[in-house]
Amino acid sequence: MNGEYDYEDGAQHQDGARESAVAGASNTNQISTSFFPPPPQVYKKFTKRNLRYLEILNSHKLADDEPSWDLLSVTQRLERQNAILRQPGSSSKIDAEQLQDEEADMAAIQDQDCDKPMTDLPDFDLKAELEPPNVDWIEEDGGYTVFGQLWPIPDVTPTLQQLGIPVLYPLEGTDRKELLLTLLRTLLQTYREITGDLLKPAQPYDVWVPAVPDPNLTPEQQQQQMATNPGFWTQTTEAKDRLKHMQNVVVNMQFLINELRPVQAKETLKLIMQMQLERRKQEMQLIQERCATMRARVEELKKMLGKQSDCYGSS
């Protein structure tokens, strides 16, 4: 390393290095949204040898005229990495025998890595792939992605308007418990109406839609049009509308219940403290009863000993 570096070029490549450090292997691996997704393929790079190489890179001290890793492009980072790992000295040497013994336990995971000769160096950026992502960058991006879903920072619960769901209750100045009871009655009423619709005979076309005459035609032409095409029958959408209304009611109820979570936590804590107080009162009462029993027993023993001493004295 000669220490010469173009800082303007490094500033241009900083964003590229940052994106590669944050994304890691997710750019090359397809995102899995299954309930039990497989682990990311980047775990195969966490071998004993690569971790040793990473320790060497982290322990290496840069010169005063050398730029930091964040200012380098991807190519420049790899060049510096290989140059540091090829440096002679005890700090950059890896004992081959010790390494083979340590990697024997991971043979099932890293067969390909063990087959490589010890002189081969990794062809990827060790610091970008193996080090944890920079939290500051994640906060600047405003969120992070987990299994294909974006989670914002800070975690904000979206409102019903943002989710595209109609709000069926006033937003302010109303008791949430009363609103839940009202929504529950609405849900039961809509369910009863849907049940009544299902009990009716099947009518695939039960709504008559009259035709609308063309206003550009003369009255005689409009009458002729209405005579040839008076309208058509179609299916009713009442059942679908009621089902959609039930879904909206349930979502509104869930949203209200989530708003009551702090109140529920406070009431639960109050109940737990009351239960602890009652349990301690019961324990104290039990201790007092046991103490009273022991006192009575001691008094009985004293009386028995007194009687025995009187008997021995009289004899």
Curated annotation (Swiss-Prot):
Belongs to the Mediator complex subunit 7 family. Residues 1-36 are annotated as: Disordered. GO terms for molecular function: transcription coregulator activity. Component of the Mediator complex. This is Mediator of RNA polymerase II transcription subunit 7. Residues 25-35 have a biased composition (Polar residues). It is found in: Nucleus. One of its GO terms (biological process) is regulation of transcription by RNA polymerase II. Component of the Mediator complex, a coactivator involved in the regulated transcription of nearly all RNA polymerase II-dependent genes. Mediator functions as a bridge to convey information from gene-specific regulatory proteins to the basal RNA polymerase II transcription machinery. Mediator is recruited to promoters by direct interactions with regulatory proteins and serves as a scaffold for the assembly of a functional preinitiation complex with RNA polymerase II and the general transcription factors. It comes from Mycosarcoma maydis (Corn smut fungus). One of its GO terms (cellular component) is core mediator complex.
